[in-house]
Amino acid sequence: MATKKNTRKRRVKKNIESGVAHIHSTFNNTLVMITDPQGNAVAWSSAGALGFKGSRKSTPFAAQMASEAAAKAAMEHGMKNVEVAVKGPGSGREAAIRALQATGLEVSAIRDVTPVPHNGSRPPKRRRV
């Protein structure tokens, strides 16, 4: 039985001028994915992927760091301006948008794409602290 050689695909530098930054901010984490206009992923990051654990993942600072990491990776592919699509009720929404602007990406539009149920499934019970 021959051993299979582990060949890893090299990351190709794409030349993409503009794209869409999808910020998914939940109560527990913030995910930032930057795609080309067709929706193909260029770069992504999250608070958990950067080493934040537990309740620290849900902070605005963790969202800011995740946003900066994704923006730097996207700028390596030649990205200059992005549209921002924000989804979810988390605390890191505004911090992530501000971090994208601070890294040098030009934000052309901000859209809120949070899904709103037309009376779908029953929500989780209220917390009693």
UniProtKB/Swiss-Prot annotation:
Entry annotated with the keyword Ribonucleoprotein: yes
Keyword tags: Ribonucleoprotein, Ribosomal protein, RNA-binding, rRNA-binding
Top-level taxon of origin: Bacteria
InterPro entries: Ribosomal_uS11 (IPR001971), Ribosomal_uS11_bac-type (IPR019981), Ribosomal_uS11_CS (IPR018102), Ribosomal_uS11_sf (IPR036967)
Gene3D superfamilies, alphabetized: Ribosomal protein S11
Assembly behavior: Part of the 30S ribosomal subunit. Interacts with proteins S7 and S18. Binds to IF-3.
Function summary: Located on the platform of the 30S subunit, it bridges several disparate RNA helices of the 16S rRNA. Forms part of the Shine-Dalgarno cleft in the 70S ribosome.
Name by which UniProt lists this protein: Small ribosomal subunit protein uS11
UniProt lineage: Bacteria, Bacillati, Bacillota, Bacilli, Lactobacillales
